[in-house]
Amino acid sequence: MLNKELEIFKKNLSSYTQSCRKFFLKQGAFSLYHSKNMDNFIKKAYDIVLKDYFDDFSPPSDNIPFCVLASKAYANNSLCFNESISLIFVYKDIKAFHLKPMIKAFIEILNDAHLQIDSVILEFNGLYNASNELKTSIIQTRFICGSRILFKRIKIKFESILKENKNDFAKLLLENFKEFDIPFIKQEFNILKDFGGLNHLRSLESLLVLFKTSPKNYALNFIDEKNLSELRLAGDFLLSLKS
């Protein structure tokens, strides 16, 4: 029965991959639709793993100390079609749950289905010990599936880490803008070399999230609504071009 579910899962993902270009007709929102569809495939893969490990005795997801988070561009629903999906797997090491083999099986299912993922596995109590470069992946995160109880605790830790390391994270992100140190008149947009392209835009978005202190978009402290709208349209164009 499980093998049949896996085959159906792989078939559905393959069919989606072949037909997903239709989302280009969604008037610039194709990346949002694509990200949401990826969410559904990841949730389905998790359901298959739970059934494999718990059979008919699976506890509610909230009671399993594990959750899957989207990070980086995927968390912001600004994912290109040909781009790896950034995931963070967070678990709490509890005696009653031997979760490492389950997480490994989860990743194997995604890989076997040819879903490109860029994943990080973190133990809840070890979040503070992760390297700064790894910690920057938590600047933009979004819950996909798993325990919401654990996710609430993770959010508190993430907020604490971001607050304590804000300046260090900002320095790491600003490293991506070294090319802009040359005089403006000599700067030339070059999407092939990603000068003024999608990676710079994403680094800018991470900086804005890092220093955000209210629901209002932090960019509005520097530009008006019209310019922000133009920036978003430019981002949509770059996403479609890269896809």
Residue ranges of each PLM-predicted region?
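Short, well-ordered alpha-helical packing segments
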Residues: 86-89, 103-114, 202-205, 232-242
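Helical scaffold of the NTase/Pol beta-like nucleotidyltransferase catalytic core
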Residues: 1-66
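Active-site nucleotide-donor binding segment shared across nucleotidyl transfer reactions
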Residues: 43, 47-95, 100
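Conserved nucleotidyltransferase catalytic core and NTase-mimicking acidic/glycine-rich helix/loop elements
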Residues: 164-243
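Short acidic (Asp/Glu) and glycine-rich catalytic loops that position anionic groups and cofactors
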Residues: 17-19, 85-86, 117-119, 134-137, ...
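Helix-loop-helix transmembrane hairpins and adjacent membrane-interface loops
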Residues: 59-60, 76, 81, 93, ...
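Conserved catalytic core of two-metal-ion nucleotidyltransferases
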Residues: 35-43, 49, 58-61, 99-153, ...
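Generic start-of-chain signal for non-secretory N-termini
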Residues: 1-30, 108-113, 126-164
